[in-house]
Design a protein with these regions (language model features):
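Aromatic-lined, polymer-binding surfaces characteristic
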Residues: 85, 91-98, 124-158
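Alpha-helical support elements that line or immediately flank enzyme active sites
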Residues: 15-18, 26-29, 95-125, 155-158
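Solvent-exposed, acidic/flexible segments
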Residues: 56, 60-63, 94, 108, ...
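Extracellular/oxidizing-compartment recognition motifs
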Residues: 1-87, 113-118, 128-129, 133-142
Length: 158
């Protein structure tokens, strides 16, 4: 993403709308001398603080970091529907990814309503024979029905 500031006034801000990005690092390049007062990352997720349930802390900093990364993975991927990754344009509700992470997600947060809505997407996307898709809601690809691993989500997630 590239944004050019107008250069008017002492302070300018930029806040993208109708999009989100998954990232670990941010790079800012300026052609002129600038003073950056602050850069703020705003998490966007369907998991609210009120939904959070489980918490675990160990005496090992590496394990605690793994737990934190897992929690942030949930925050990053649970946005209206469970996605497989927030950093690509794809951002689809891949069913295999969801069924693998669902149990962990339910430890960290009360995801009942969130998953109930997504399971309705699964039912709406079922084939006439009852097969579940690879992606829910139905999308431009990932629509092969009854694929082992992906279709299993229709039984494992609920």
């Amino acid at each position: 993403m590239q944004y050019t500031f107008a250069g008017k006034g002492d302070y300018e801000t930029y806040h993208p709308t109708r999009t989100f990005f998954g990232y670990r690092f941010l790079s800012i390049t300026a052609t002129d001398e600038v003073r950056i007062k602050s850069v703020k990352s705003i998490p966007v997720t369907s998991i609210t603080k009120e939904m959070e349930t489980g918490k675990i802390t160990t005496g090992n900093d590496l394990i605690n970091k793994l737990i934190s990364n897992t929690r942030w993975g949930m925050y990053s991927n649970y946005l209206s529907l469970p996605t497989d990754c927030p950093q690509r344009d794809e951002r689809l509700g891949w069913t295999a990814d969801t069924q693998v992470f669902t149990e962990t997600g339910t430890f960290f947060a009360n995801t009942d309503r969130f998953m109930h809505k997504w399971m309705q997407d699964m039912r709406d996307s079922q084939s006439e024979l009852g097969g579940f898709p690879g992606v829910a809601p139905f999308a431009q690809y990932g629509n092969e029905m009854m694929r082992l691993g992906w279709a299993d989500a229709g039984v494992i997630v609920p």
